[in-house]
Each structure stands twice: as structure tokens, then as C-alpha cells.
């Protein structure tokens, strides 16, 4: 019973297969279509693969095949093409003498099979598969701004990657620190989705979820889009991002800025740090040196204690405390010693030394510091280094030794850490004037501003011999400057002005001569002052007598001097005229050469030369030259030479 059934089944199968084996037309297996690849927006060239004989291409129909449905889109008759109404009506044209159909402005919807069918001499068809591609835009990555706690039980969202307007759908790969991530149960999960835009392009969105640890706080994540174009495979990478990772604090410590040795006056920051994220609430305390208990210091919101300017009192032991507000666990840092280096106030002894001329003086400088000190003594007026060390010895004191001396105490190992102290040395003596005499050029009825300076110890006082508005100003403890405003009158021009400086040891006087400025006044020399005030001479140019007073010369004596000068000039002029007259008459035994030969034996001509020098002053010679018009050579100083001969 079973055998007949088996035979019947075999015969039925043979009958069903016989027609295909016999080669019934239209039922043979079709070859694979030709592949044509283009990018969106470009032109696709669909070349009909039928026989190239004119007969085969003169009568061709083009179809688009979508979901196994053929739609006629183009006809070719006798080499002329005609589009059929529909979506391709405006985008098709013939090329290559009718062998190629051009499709412009390709879209993703054009990805399908196109078929060309020839009718003569017999029916043939050729299939073309059109593939369309579009590169996606640069991937956009967004990190999870809320961060990820390390104690999470499930993978948390790390970042989202979006690739827009690609075709077909690109492939996304996630990377961490340059290494690709793969799906891992309870550790890594990648969730992707795509959206079809109205243009037919795809937008891909991929979400990376992972469980992170503390070491991932600096990890770099990025995504990569892989896609294909007619030219081959390509890829685009996003920027790298770091996701906030939250982990508990395990350690708290202190940092001090600047690093290195600190000194008074610096800006010092004591910063509290922790290895947790987010950081705990910080507080900084300093140990009280008396009670040895920690006392909390005032810090800013970031747990930073600012010492500005730092002082010696800021030295001590500091600690930082961190309180985790989530777990309420408190951690304490290791104590750290802070040393603010200092130099105490400098003390000089004696503080106000007074000495007699010719005596000696020893100045001693003292100071304390947290480091080794170096001392040096400087002259205040010049800055000259007088001594390196705490002791300065001054011997055989002169008046010039009075004034300021500065002691500098410094720490060589810490640049800029130093203190100084100035001491003024007073040398007993009567007043010392800045100048003895001075000429001042003035105009009548003008107000003069005269000045007079004197120094000495005890401090001198200055008085004037004329009425006016006077004021004094201390230049230093032993030097005083007095100024006087006075109206120029004829009486003042006659008497001049005196300023007198006096102290317990004597007095001294400076004289100011007043001269009217007019058309006949000669230009003042370099030692006179044309302004209304006098200048102060340096101590090295002062000429002072300390126990005598110098009075202004009487008007009569000044007139006698002027008359004597005029008489001398007249006598010199007469003498010059007489000499010139005798010279022109030949009465003088000399020529222009200034030499006269005296006869001597030839053997002795070179033995005797008499030099005769003129006893006339240079001024007289100048008068003679001016009257005769005879200009002397620059080297001729009026000397005459006479050769003696037999």
C-alpha cells in the first residue's frame, strides 16, 4: 500500500517539473541586474544592455519596478524618446544615440530596478539596479549634564550621538579612550533609533549607557558614523567629551601657594582639596599656640584661606576638614606647618648720636629674624655702602660726616625680605652757610623771593637784616632753609641783604648783592643769579668762617674802587699810544719779526741767544693790537728774540 503511494508522488513531481525542463518561454531563471551607484542629487546613467544593433534600440520601452510592479516611464520609437506622465516625466532624457537613459536629480525614492525592453526582432529585456547614497552630516554628540554616580546599579546614560540626513542608514560605533565599545550585559548598552525625513533621508540617534567607575572621571568618549558612497566606505567622528562622574571622597589635604619660602607681605593662599566629586564642605582651622586647640579660620566659598599681607603671626599648624553632605562622613587632613619668614624692626644704638668734631662714633645695628641675617651700613645721601656688618666705626669726625646713616638687615636666602633704620648723626658746630656771597640781578619795585640755607648742630635759626615775609623749612635735623619775600627799593639796592644763621656755638652770615638789570648792565657771569632766588651750593663748595661777621662795604669805598679802575684804563691807553707812535717812527730797536741780529764771529753765532720778554700785560697787548690793527698769531704772546753778533 505504501509503495504505490510513493510511486504516484514521484510521478506527480516529475510532471510538474517537465515544462521548465522543456524550456517553456518566459519561465527561465533571470540573470542578476546590473548595479548602478549614484549620490543623491546627481544624474544616473541607465545604459540598456541589449544588442547594440539599430534594430534592437529603435523600439524600446523603459519600466520602473517597485514592489514587483512594472510602470512604463519612457518610450523609444525610431530613435526618439518620449516620457510617460508621472514622477519621472521631467527628469528623463536619451543619451548615447538612444542607448542610455539619463535620470537627473536622483532622490532616495529612486532606489529601485529599472528595466529596458526591446520589441524587435524579438522581445528582450535588461534589468538595472539603481543604488542611491548620501553622506550624513557631522555627528553631534551631547554628554549627560547630570553626571553618573559610580554606585549606580544599572548602566546610566553617558552621551547621545545624532547623525542627520544620511542614506542609507549609517552604522554607529562608540569609543572610550580610543577603544570601541561593545554590548556587555549590565555594563554597556547601546540603544539606536532612526527617523525617515520627508526627503527620504535618515536621521540616526544612538544612546550610550554604561556603568562607570572613579577612573572614568577623565575618560574621553566619542561616536563614529560609518557609511558608503559610490567611491567606497567612509566614516565621520564626533568631538570627544568627558562625562561628570560622581564618587565619594577618600582623602583630604592642604596646599599652600606660592610654593617655597614665604615672607611677610606676600599674598598666601591655603587651599583645602579632596579626591571626591563633588568635593565635600571644607573648613580650615589653625592651632592656638597657647591652648593647642584648633580654631576655625574664615574661608571663602571654595575653602580657600587668603592671608594678605602675610604676617609673622600667621605662622603655625593648619588642618583641613571635609564633610560629605550626602553621607555625613567627615575627613581630616594631615596637619601642615606654615612658616612666614620675617625680619623684626631694626634697632640702632645710639638712636640720636651727637659728637664733637675730631671725635669717634660707633653705631650698632640689631634685629631678629626667622633666618640668618646680613647687615650693611649705607650713607643716606649717596647710597654708598660703608660697612658690611652690624657695627659701623666712624673716626676723626668732620662736619661733613653729619647727616643720615641707614642700617639694612636682610635675609640673603629670601630676596626682598629686609628691614631698614635711619639714624642722623649730629656734629656740634656753629652754623655753616651754603654760600658766603652772591649777586642777584633784580628790577626795581619787584618782589624778590630770596633763600638762604644753613646747617649746624644745634639746629641754627636764620634772621634777615631787612623787613619782609620770612619762613623756615627743615631740610633735615641739622639743616634749615629760610625764604624771604621783599620789595626791591632804592635803599635795598644800596645796602643789599644779609641772612644770619646762629646757634649756641656761634653765627655766620651770607651776603646777597642786588644789581639792577638795565641796557648797560653786562651779562652776569656764571657765578651770579639772574632770577629772584638763590641756589644752594653743595657742602663741598662751601666757604665759611665761623666766628666773624662780614659787613657790606660802604658806598664810598665802592666809588673809590670804580674811579681807580677807570684811571688805570686811561693810563694803559696813553702808554699804548706812545709805544705805537715810537714804533711807527722807528725809534724802537725791533722789527715785525721781533728779532735783531748782533754781529758775532761765525763760530759763536749759535752760542748766544738773548730772550727778551715784554712786561706788558695781555690786556695791554690787546690794546696795542686794537689800535694798530696788527693781528698777532695765536702763538705769539708778545715775546721777542734777539740774536747777538759781533
Curated annotation (Swiss-Prot):
Ig-like V-type domain segment(s): 24-129, 139-242
SMART domains, A to Z: IG (SM00409), IGc2 (SM00408)
Compartments (UniProt record): Membrane
Topological domain ranges for the Cytoplasmic compartment: 584-646
Keywords: Cell adhesion, Disulfide bond, Glycoprotein, Immunoglobulin domain, Membrane, Phosphoprotein, Repeat, Signal, Transmembrane, Transmembrane helix
Basic and acidic residues bias spans: 629-646
Main localization category: membrane
Region (Disordered): 278-299, 525-554, 620-646
Domain Ig-like C2-type: 244-330, 335-424, 430-510
Ranges annotated as biased composition (Polar residues): 533-547
A GO molecular-function descriptor: laminin receptor activity
GO biological process: anatomical structure morphogenesis; angiogenesis; cell adhesion; glomerular filtration; positive regulation of cell migration; vascular wound healing
Disulfide bonds: 48-116, 161-223, 272-320, 365-407, 452-499
Signal peptide extent: 1-23
Extracellular compartment residues: 24-559
Membrane topology: Single-pass type I membrane protein
Transmembrane segments: 560-583
Modified residues (Phosphoserine): 606, 614, 628
Gene3D superfamilies linked to this entry: Immunoglobulins (2.60.40.10)
GO cellular component: external side of plasma membrane; extracellular region; extracellular space; focal adhesion; plasma membrane
Role of this protein: Plays a role in cell adhesion, and in cohesion of the endothelial monolayer at intercellular junctions in vascular tissue. Its expression may allow melanoma cells to interact with cellular elements of the vascular system, thereby enhancing hematogeneous tumor spread. Could be an adhesion molecule active in neural crest cells during embryonic development. Acts as a surface receptor that triggers tyrosine phosphorylation of FYN and PTK2/FAK1, and a transient increase in the intracellular calcium concentration.
Protein name: Cell surface glycoprotein MUC18
Protein's organism: Homo sapiens
Amino acid at each position: 500500500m505504501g509503495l504505490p503511494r510513493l510511486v504516484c508522488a514521484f510521478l506527480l513531481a516529475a510532471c510538474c517539473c517537465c515544462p521548465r525542463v522543456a524550456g517553456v518561454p518566459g519561465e527561465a531563471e533571470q540573470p542578476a541586474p546590473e548595479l548602478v551607484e549614484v549620490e543623491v542629487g546627481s544624474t544616473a546613467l541607465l545604459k540598456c544592455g541589449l544588442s547594440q544593433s539599430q534594430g534592437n534600440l529603435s523600439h524600446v520601452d523603459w519600466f520602473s519596478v517597485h514592489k514587483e510592479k512594472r510602470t512604463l516611464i519612457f518610450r523609444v520609437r525610431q530613435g526618439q524618446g518620449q516620457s510617460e506622465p508621472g514622477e519621472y516625466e521631467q527628469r528623463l532624457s536619451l543619451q548615447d544615440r538612444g542607448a542610455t537613459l539619463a535620470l537627473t536629480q536622483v532622490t532616495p525614492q529612486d532606489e529601485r530596478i529599472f528595466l529596458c525592453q526591446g520589441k524587435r526582432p524579438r522581445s528582450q529585456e535588461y534589468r538595472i539596479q539603481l543604488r542611491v547614497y548620501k553622506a550624513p552630516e557631522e555627528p553631534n554628540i551631547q554628554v549627560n549634564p547630570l553626571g553618573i554616580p559610580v554606585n549606580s546599579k544599572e548602566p546610566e546614560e553617558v552621551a547621545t550621538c545624532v547623525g542627520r540626513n544620511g542614506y542609507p542608514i549609517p552604522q554607529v560605533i562608540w569609543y572610550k579612550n580610543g577603544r570601541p565599545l561593545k554590548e556587555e550585559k549590565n555594563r554597556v548598552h547601546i540603544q539606536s533609533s532612526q527617523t525617515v525625513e520627508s526627503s527620504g533621508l535618515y536621521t540616526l540617534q544612538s544612546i550610550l549607557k554604561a556603568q562607570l567607575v572613579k577612573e572614568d572621571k577623565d575618560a574621553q568618549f566619542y561616536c563614529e558614523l560609518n557609511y558608503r558612497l559610490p567611491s567606497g566606505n567612509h566614516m565621520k567622528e564626533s568631538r570627544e567629551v568627558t562625562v561628570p562622574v560622581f564618587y565619594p571622597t577618600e582623602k583630604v589635604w592642604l596646599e599652600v601657594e606660592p610654593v617655597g619660602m614665604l615672607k611677610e607681605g606676600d599674598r598666601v593662599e591655603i587651599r583645602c582639596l579632596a579626591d571626591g566629586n563633588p568635593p565635600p564642605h571644607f573648613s580650615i582651622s589653625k592651632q592656638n599656640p597657647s591652648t593647642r586647640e584648633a580654631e576655625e579660620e574664615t574661608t571663602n566659598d571654595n575653602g580657600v584661606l587668603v592671608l594678605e599681607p602675610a604676617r609673622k603671626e600667621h605662622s603655625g599648624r593648619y588642618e583641613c576638614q571635609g564633610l560629605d553632605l550626602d553621607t555625613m562622613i567627615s575627613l581630616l587632613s594631615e596637619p601642615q606647618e606654615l612658616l612666614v619668614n620675617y625680619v623684626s624692626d631694626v634697632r640702632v644704638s645710639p638712636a640720636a648720636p651727637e659728637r664733637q668734631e675730631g671725635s669717634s662714633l660707633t653705631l650698632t645695628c640689631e634685629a631678629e629674624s626667622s633666618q640668618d641675617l646680613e647687615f650693611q651700613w649705607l650713607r643716606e645721601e649717596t647710597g654708598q655702602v660703608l660697612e658690611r656688618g652690624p657695627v659701623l666705626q666712624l673716626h676723626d669726625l668732620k662736619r661733613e660726616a653729619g647727616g643720615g646713616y641707614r642700617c639694612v638687615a636682610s635675609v640673603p636666602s629670601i630676596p626682598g625680605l629686609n628691614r631698614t633704620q635711619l639714624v642722623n648723626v649730629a656734629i656740634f658746630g656753629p652754623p655753616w652757610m651754603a654760600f658766603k656771597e652772591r649777586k642777584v640781578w633784580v628790577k626795581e619795585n619787584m618782589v624778590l623771593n630770596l633763600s638762604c640755607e644753613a646747617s649746624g648742630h644745634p639746629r641754627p635759626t636764620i634772621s634777615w637784616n631787612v623787613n619782609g615775609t620770612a619762613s623756615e623749612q627743615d631740610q633735615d635735623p641739622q639743616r634749615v632753609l629760610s625764604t624771604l619775600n621783599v620789595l626791591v627799593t632804592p635803599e635795598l639796592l644800596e645796602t643789599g641783604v644779609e641772612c644770619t644763621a646762629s646757634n649756641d656755638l656761634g653765627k655766620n652770615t651770607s651776603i646777597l648783592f642786588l644789581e639792577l638789570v638795565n641796557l648797560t648792565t653786562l651779562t652776569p657771569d656764571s657765578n651770579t643769579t639772574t632770577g629772584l632766588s638763590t641756589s644752594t651750593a653743595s657742602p663741598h663748595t662751601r666757604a665759611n668762617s665761623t666766628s666773624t661777621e662780614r659787613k657790606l662795604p660802604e658806598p664810598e669805598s665802592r666809588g673809590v674802587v670804580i674811579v681807580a679802575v677807570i684811571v688805570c684804563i686811561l693810563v694803559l691807553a696813553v702808554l699804548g699810544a706812545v709805544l705805537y707812535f715810537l714804533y711807527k717812527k722807528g725809534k724802537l730797536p725791533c722789527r715785525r719779526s721781533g728779532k735783531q741780529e748782533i754781529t758775532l764771529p761765525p763760530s759763536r753765532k749759535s752760542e748766544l741767544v738773548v730772550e727778551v720778554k715784554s712786561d706788558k700785560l695781555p690786556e695791554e697787548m690787546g690794546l696795542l693790537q686794537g689800535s694798530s690793527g696788527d693781528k698777532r698769531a695765536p702763538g705769539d704772546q708778545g715775546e721777542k728774540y734777539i740774536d747777538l753778533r759781533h
